[in-house]
């Protein structure tokens, strides 16, 4: 569909616009539509009627702001009020009241919702669009079988197929098929109407005998025959109203409701003129679809490409919220109907307010945001992550595909994705190709299709007009890519340009072009658009880079990149992490947590985010960037947020890197780093962890928060205040008590001390006992307490426990085991931190900061990192920043290389450092060994790329276990750091040990130390004292488990021990 034309050049749309438009569509259209569908409800005697007066519904603004909702773990929602009336039919009296229907979670300025204090976001889902699709398959004998699949709005399917005898069937399941004549008659058509409305009546008459004519002689007979075949019922069922209701519920409602989009698709595909408001499948649809199926069999018509985006629709946040709203209203209807009947039965006088409660709507939305697979916790690792999360497209979820069953063809890139879905950005692993990302300029149309903008090329008009095309329309135009400069009207000579037409790529004269792309980034997502020189990288590495940029941790001292693409400012602006001036005025005062702005005669106080925890435990913090007395304009940046500098995205650091081997410490993607990165806090990041504890009412009394905890050392309680809560600002170590809590419990007589027994015997005093259930700081949690929150829910009952939350700030320098990465998929683990004097150094004496392995470049084909590295060196010397759009080879051949070499040459001239650009090996330089002072044999590439520190840090992953819990069934150590699990000796580890012939070590690891219950208890003592581990006489537990599993299959397995002396077989029971 062609969108409205916009004259002039295009601008980058708001990156959160997809979420905003969806939520506004729900509020403006979905909410009233759902309320208008609410039926009138009558009691059983039909004396009282309840109805909603939808015209006067109201949505009230929330009573709390977003910050308080997060602080108190509440939902940021609006209250929905609707006028309702009770009508007594006998007297025609009306009682009208405004009722509170429930709370609807609102969307904030970031495109997210706050539910129970947690930022959540709803993902857009890609589903098969309702309508009819024709395909051809080969049967076992090699003959083509043509089928037409009708997909309903609910996802139900009805297949029409034609067999060898030209008989047409409607298949309702794999084993059940029904004659199309029976189906059409059951839907209300008689035989004469069927034959009048089809193009090939002779085919329909050919397989109709006298018995079949009797079956469809009347509508009742057709319904009975349809029910007999559909439900596989034997005998002669009797026509009744309940039988029709069962068919309506099990078949017609699931498979025949097309919806608004399905009706439009059916009309277009079958050339029908049925009104749009008729959203159910009609006999005319069935018969016309059968005519098309017959035409397909005889070579007329085109089969459908099921993976084309014109056959898909986007289930946006508006559709999901509207579905949940309809579900809540159905529950409300059932509740009102039951309440009215109960009130009449007990002879009570109901009122509208008594009949309606807010529970159905509120609980429906809370369960949706908390449990639905498409409602996810917002990833707040960095500003880029927040934006990209809201632009994801998923084939998974209810009604969609699964990672186990999706085929390769569905996951693959399709030509219709051009300018709509990024061909680069997708998840890695089992969901590859099933979770994608919207292209930058793409938008979701009113019919659920993804539209992409193009410039119209017209010889008649000199004006540039921008059109938004849906996937079903752009294949009829010659579309030139935005990489070509031959579309300039000033170029008179005839030139050929690459173009796309009907999913094929052609080379045509530029006069034949109808449309052209508007931007080189048009077909990329945000993550891929931030990769400089992406055209020089392999697509797999570009995919890794776009994913790893979302894992970058905000650093304490952010720095914007020397080499970028120009989108960094837009991403930082739309992420909402920076403070933006909403009015113009003058700055009158600034401090760390607030900015005061005087404008329009008022003084505005703008609060700043100070050390706030994100959902990924990173630190969100804003730093003022304006000074007192400065004049500010509307839209100007007042404060930078996490990972932003001067309003631009700043995820990493520009560091000096050399590509060369160094003593094997950077082999296999390992990275050697300079100690300067540690001591100067180059890659230092802050992380905030949340620890919470609740107080409950037990059967022996309520739990108490106190600082008087018996049987604990005073050293562990040193940070508690008089209330038993850790003091704000204190430094805590592993094992320290954060909150002191005692839980009452029943004491046994044997547990009393002699003093307690004496008090009970003499004075009759009942000594209360309690168990220590304090909140202790777990391993790896050391840091500074920056916030303490004591949340007391209203009511104070046992069902609303008090919650105490402790927030601890950790300062993490880069260390061995941390993961670092560039923007080209070049990732590695820090293997060694070398002193500055031992690091390789350049000809001007500067030691490099990192040493990468040069072998990681050619095999991975991500040469873009070399261009960025060299250009970053030139920019660092010249104090310049570069913003380069991709595919700059459209200007001339080797444009990237020429740009890099020219900047290196200029840097060497201006700084009088000829080693920066040496004609014999441009981009390389001689590097000296810091330990000996001698130069390395070969010159190496060195420069200043942009390197990120990722959230995969060794502090979160390192784990050790001496002994711990074992699985109950296999008696093997548990798996995972969270469960204090043990090491896994897998196949490859066994192969490595087998290669060295260490049979005894293998036996110990696989049996004695793992799942042999008796022997593993003796291993520790034997290891300490010395000696050999005694050989067990029975089998390990995993072998015993295997024996029992085989016994469950009626197979008996015995094992035997062979004596070395006489080789006699002694039978041992397993």
From Swiss-Prot:
Protein's UniProt name: DNA-directed RNA polymerase subunit beta
Family designation: Belongs to the RNA polymerase beta chain family.
Enzyme Commission number: 2.7.7.6
Pfam family, one: RNA_pol_Rpb2_2
Lineage: Eukaryota, Viridiplantae, Streptophyta, Embryophyta, Tracheophyta
Subunit (UniProt): In plastids the minimal PEP RNA polymerase catalytic core is composed of four subunits: alpha, beta, beta', and beta''. When a (nuclear-encoded) sigma factor is associated with the core the holoenzyme is formed, which can initiate transcription.
Compartments, as annotated in UniProt: Plastid, Chloroplast
Record-level GO cellular component terms: chloroplast; DNA-directed RNA polymerase complex; mitochondrion
Signal peptide: none
HAMAP family, per database record: RNApol_bact_RpoB
NCBIfam families: PRK00405.1
Protein origin, superkingdom: Eukaryota
Species the sequence originates in: Glycine max
Record keywords: Chloroplast, DNA-directed RNA polymerase, Nucleotidyltransferase, Plastid, Transcription, Transferase
Designated gene of the protein: rpoB
Acyltransferase found in the keyword field: no
CDD domains assigned: RNA_pol_B_RPB2 (cd00653)
Main localization, broad class: plastid
């Amino acid at each position: 569909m062609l969108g409205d034309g916009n004259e002039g050049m295009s601008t980058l749309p708001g990156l959160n616009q997809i979420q905003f438009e969806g939520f506004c569509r729900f509020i403006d259209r979905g909410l009233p539509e759902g309320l208008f569908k609410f039926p009138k409800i009558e009691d059983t005697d039909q004396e009282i009627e309840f109805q909603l007066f939808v015209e006067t519904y109201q949505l009230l603004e929330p009573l709390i702001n977003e910050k308080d909702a997060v602080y108190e773990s509440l939902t940021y929602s609006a209250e929905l009020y609707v006028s309702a009336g009770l009508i007594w039919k006998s007297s025609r009296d009306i009682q009208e009241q405004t009722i509170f229907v429930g709370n609807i979670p609102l969307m904030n300025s970031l495109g997210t919702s706050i539910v129970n204090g947690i930022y959540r976001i709803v993902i857009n889902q890609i589903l098969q669009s309702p309508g009819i699709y024709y395909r051809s398959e080969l049967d076992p004998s090699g003959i083509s079988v043509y089928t037409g699949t009708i997909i309903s709005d609910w996802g139900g399917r009805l297949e029409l197929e034609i067999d060898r005898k030209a008989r047409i069937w409607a298949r309702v399941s794999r084993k059940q098929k029904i004659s199309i004549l029976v189906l059409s008659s059951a839907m209300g058509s008689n035989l004469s109407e069927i034959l009048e409305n089809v193009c090939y009546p002779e085919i329909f008459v050919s397989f109709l005998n006298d018995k079949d004519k009797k079956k469809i002689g009347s509508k009742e007979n057709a319904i009975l025959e349809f029910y007999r075949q559909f439900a596989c019922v034997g005998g002669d069922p009797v026509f009744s109203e309940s039988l029709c209701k069962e068919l309506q519920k099990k078949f017609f409602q699931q498979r025949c409701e097309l919806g608004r989009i399905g009706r439009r698709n059916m009309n277009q595909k079958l050339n029908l003129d049925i009104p749009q408001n008729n959203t159910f499948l009609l006999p005319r649809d069935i018969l016309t679809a059968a005519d098309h199926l017959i035409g397909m069999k005889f070579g007329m018509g085109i089969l459908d490409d099921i993976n084309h985006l014109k056959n898909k629709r986007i289930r946006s946040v508006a559709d999901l919220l509207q579905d949940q709203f309809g579900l809540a209203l159905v529950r409300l209807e059932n509740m009102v109907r039951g309440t009215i009947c109960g009130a009449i039965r007990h002879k009570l006088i109901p009122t509208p307010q008594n009949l309606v409660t807010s529970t159905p709507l509120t609980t429906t939305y809370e369960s949706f945001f908390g449990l639905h697979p498409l409602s996810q916790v917002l990833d707040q690792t960095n500003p880029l992550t927040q934006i990209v999360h809201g632009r994801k497209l998923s084939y998974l979820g209810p009604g969609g595909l699964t990672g186990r069953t999706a085929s390769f063809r569905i996951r693959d890139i399709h030509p219709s994705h051009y300018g709509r879905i990024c061909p680069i950005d997708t998840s890695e692993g089992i969901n590859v190709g099933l979770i994608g990302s919207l292209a930058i300029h793409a938008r979701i149309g009113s019919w659920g299709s993804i539209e992409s903008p193009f410039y119209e090329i017209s010889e008649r008009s000199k004006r540039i007009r921008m059109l938004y095309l849906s996937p079903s329309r752009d294949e009829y135009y010659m579309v030139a890519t935005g990489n070509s400069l031959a579309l300039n009207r000033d170029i008179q000579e005839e030139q050929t340009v690459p173009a796309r037409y009907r999913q094929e790529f052609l080379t045509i004269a530029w006069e034949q072009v109808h449309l052209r792309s508007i931007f080189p980034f048009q077909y990329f997502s945000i993550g891929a658009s931030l990769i400089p020189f992406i055209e020089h990288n392999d697509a797999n590495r570009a995919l890794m880079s776009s994913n790893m940029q979302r894992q970058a941790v905000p650093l304490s001292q952010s720095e914007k990149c020397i080499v970028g693409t120009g989108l960094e400012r837009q991403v930082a602006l739309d992420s909402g992490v920076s403070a933006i001036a909403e009015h113009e005025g003058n700055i009158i005062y600034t401090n760390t947590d607030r900015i005061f702005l005087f404008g329009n005669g008022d003084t505005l106080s703008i609060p700043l985010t100070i050390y706030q925890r994100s959902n990924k435990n990173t630190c969100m913090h804003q730093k003022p960037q304006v000074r007192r007395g400065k004049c500010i304009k509307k839209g100007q940046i007042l404060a930078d947020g996490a990972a932003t500098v001067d309003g631009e995205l700043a995820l990493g650091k520009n560091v000096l890197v050399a590509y060369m081997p160094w003593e094997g410490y950077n082999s296999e993607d390992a990275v050697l780093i300079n100690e300067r990165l540690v001591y100067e806090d180059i890659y230092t990041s802050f992380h905030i962890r949340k620890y919470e504890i609740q107080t409950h009412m037990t059967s022996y009394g309520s739990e108490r928060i106190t600082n008087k905890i018996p049987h604990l050392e005073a050293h562990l309680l040193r940070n508690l205040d008089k209330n038993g809560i850790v003091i704000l600002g204190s430094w805590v170590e592993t094992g320290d008590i954060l909150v002191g809590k005692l839980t009452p419990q029943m004491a046994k007589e044997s547990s009393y001390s002699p003093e307690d027994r004496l008090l009970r015997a003499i004075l009759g005093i009942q000594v209360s006992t309690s168990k220590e259930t304090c909140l202790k700081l777990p391993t790896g949690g050391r840091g500074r307490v920056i916030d303490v929150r004591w949340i007391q829910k209203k009511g104070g009952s046992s069902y609303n426990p008090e919650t105490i939350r402790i927030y601890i700030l950790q300062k993490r320098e880069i260390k061995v085991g941390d993961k670092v990465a560039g923007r080209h998929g070049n990732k590695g683990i820090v293997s060694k931190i070398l002193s500055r004097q031992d690091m390789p150094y350049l000809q001007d004496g500067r030691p490099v900061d990192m040493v990468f392995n040069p072998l990681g470049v050619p095999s991975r084909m991500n040469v873009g990192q070399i261009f960025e590295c060299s250009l970053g060196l030139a920019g660092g010397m010249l104090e310049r920043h570069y913003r380069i759009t991709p595919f700059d080879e459209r200007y001339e051949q080797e444009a990237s290389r020429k740009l890099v070499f020219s900047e290196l040459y200029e840097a060497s001239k201006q700084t009088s450092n000829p080693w920066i650009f040496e004609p014999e090996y441009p981009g390389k330089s001689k590097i000296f060994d810091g330990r000996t002072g001698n130069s390395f044999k070969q010159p190496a590439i060195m420069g200043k790329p942009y390197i990120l520190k990722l959230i995969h840090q060794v502090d979160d992953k390192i784990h050790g276990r001496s002994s711990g819990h074992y699985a109950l069934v296999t008696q093997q150590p548990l798996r995972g750091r969270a469960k204090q699990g043990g090491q896994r000796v897998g196949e490859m580890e066994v192969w490595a040990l087998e290669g060295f012939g260490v049979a005894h070590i293998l036996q110990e690891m696989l049996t004695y130390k793992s799942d042999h219950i008796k022997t593993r208890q003796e291993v520790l003592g034997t290891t300490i004292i010395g000696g050999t581990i005694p050989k067990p006489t029975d089998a390990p537990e995993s072998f015993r488990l295997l024996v029992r599993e085989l016994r469950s299959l009626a197979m008996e397995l015995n094992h035997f021990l062979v004596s070395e002396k006489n080789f006699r077989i002694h039978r041992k029971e397993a």
